[in-house]
C-alpha cells in the first residue's frame, strides 16, 4: 500500500469577491461600467483565492495531508479567510500579521467579456523566507509555491528571496513545484527581469506549471506582443498552435527547467518531461515507482 502523502502549499493567498452580473449585458465594457451609473448585480460570491488556498485545499480534497503557509492581516477580510480555512481544518500554518492588510480581489465576470481583476496584494508583498517553517517543510513529500509575480519580496533584488527558498527546500530532498500569475503591465513586477529570475530558480524546481500567456510575457515579450496583435482582442490561446509553444518549451529547457506543464487554455496542456536521470532522482525523492514515468518519457522522445 502506498504511504500517506503530505504537502505544503505556500505563497499567495487572498479573498476573492465576485459580484454576479446578470446575463445579456453585451460585450462593450465602457457601456456597462459608466461613471455615475448604478448597476444592479446579484449576491457576491466570496471565497478564498491564490495558490495557497486553491492548490492547497484541492490537494487536501484529493486525500493529501496539506499544510497551508500564507500571510494575512488581522482584519475583517483576514478573519473571513481564516473562517473558510478552519472549515476545512486547514488554518494551522497561516501567519496573521497585525501590521499588514489582507489581500483581496474584486473579480468582474461580466457575461460576454473576459474576466477582469482588481487586486490588492496586501500581506503577500511582505511574505518572505523567514515566514516559512522549513522544519515542517522538510517532513513533507511536496512543496508547492505560487504566484511570485504578485509577491514583492519574491521578485525584487532579481528574485533573490525566491531562489533562496527553492534552494533550501530542494536541498532538503522535498519535491518542489512552482506556479506563476499574470502581471499587470503597469506594475513594478512588470519591470523585473523575469527571464533572469526564472533562469536562477528553475534548476531547483521539479515541476514548473505556468500558463502560456504568463510564460511568454516573461521570457519572450516581443513574441507575446505579436500574439496579442494576431488575437485582435480575442482570447490569445485561441490563436496558438504547437509551433508557437515549442520555441518557449525549448527555451525553458535551456534555462534549466526540469519537468514543466504549460497551461494553454481551451486548446489543452503541453507537458515536457525531464530526462531519465532527473526522473530517477525524483523517484528516489518521492518513493514513487517510475514505471509510468519511463513509459511517458519514451513517448515524449518518439
Annotate each predicted stretch with a short phrase.
Residues 1-69, 76-87, 112, 287-302:
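Glycine-rich phosphate/adenosyl-contacting loop at the front of the ribokinase-like
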Residues 66, 92, 176-177:
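Hydrophobic beta-strand scaffold residues
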Residues 83-100:
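A glycine-rich helix N-cap at a beta->alpha junction
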Residues 93-97, 107-155:
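Conserved phosphate-binding/catalytic loop of the ribokinase/pfkB sugar-kinase fold
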Residues 150-160, 188, 218-219, 226-228:
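Glycine/threonine-rich flexible loop motifs
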Residues 157-164, 190-199:
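Charged helix-capping and loop-helix junction motifs
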Amino acid at each position: 500500500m502506498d504511504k500517506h502523502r503530505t504537502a505544503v502549499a505556500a505563497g499567495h493567498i487572498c479573498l476573492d469577491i465576485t459580484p454576479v452580473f446578470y446575463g445579456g449585458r453585451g460585450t462593450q465594457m465602457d457601456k456597462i461600467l459608466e461613471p455615475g451609473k448604478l448597476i444592479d448585480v446579484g449576491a457576491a460570491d466570496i471565497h478564498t483565492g491564490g495558490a495557497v488556498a486553491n492548490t492547497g485545499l484541492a490537494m487536501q480534497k484529493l486525500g493529501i495531508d496539506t499544510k497551508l503557509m500564507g500571510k494575512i492581516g488581522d482584519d475583517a477580510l483576514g478573519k473571513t479567510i481564516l473562517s473558510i480555512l478552519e472549515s476545512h481544518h486547514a488554518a494551522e500554518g497561516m501567519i496573521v500579521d497585525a501590521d499588514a492588510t489582507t489581500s483581496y480581489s474584486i473579480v468582474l465576470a461580466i457575461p460576454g467579456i473576459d474576466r477582469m481583476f482588481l487586486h490588492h496584494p496586501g500581506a503577500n508583498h511582505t511574505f518572505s523566507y523567514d515566514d516559512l517553517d522549513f522544519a515542517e517543510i522538510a517532513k513533507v513529500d511536496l512543496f508547492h509555491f505560487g504566484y511570485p509575480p504578485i509577491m514583492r519580496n519574491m521578485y525584487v533584488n532579481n528574485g533573490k528571496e525566491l531562489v533562496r527558498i527553492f534552494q533550501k527546500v530542494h536541498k532538503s530532498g522535498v519535491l518542489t513545484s512552482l506556479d506563476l500569475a499574470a502581471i499587470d503591465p503597469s506594475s513594478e513586477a512588470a519591470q523585473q527581469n523575469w527571464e533572469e529570475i526564472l533562469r536562477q530558480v528553475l534548476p531547483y524546481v521539479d515541476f514548473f506549471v505556468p500558463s502560456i500567456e504568463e510564460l511568454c510575457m516573461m521570457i519572450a515579450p516581443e513574441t507575446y506582443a505579436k500574439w496579442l496583435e494576431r488575437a485582435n482582442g480575442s482570447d490569445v490561446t485561441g490563436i496558438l498552435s504547437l509551433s508557437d509553444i515549442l520555441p518557449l518549451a525549448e527555451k525553458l529547457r535551456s534555462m534549466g527547467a526540469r519537468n514543466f506543464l504549460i497551461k494553454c487554455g481551451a486548446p489543452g496542456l503541453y507537458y515536457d518531461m525531464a530526462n531519465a536521470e532527473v526522473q530517477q532522482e525524483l523517484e528516489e525523492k518521492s518513493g514513487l515507482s517510475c514505471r509510468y514515468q519511463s513509459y511517458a518519457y519514451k513517448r515524449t522522445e518518439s
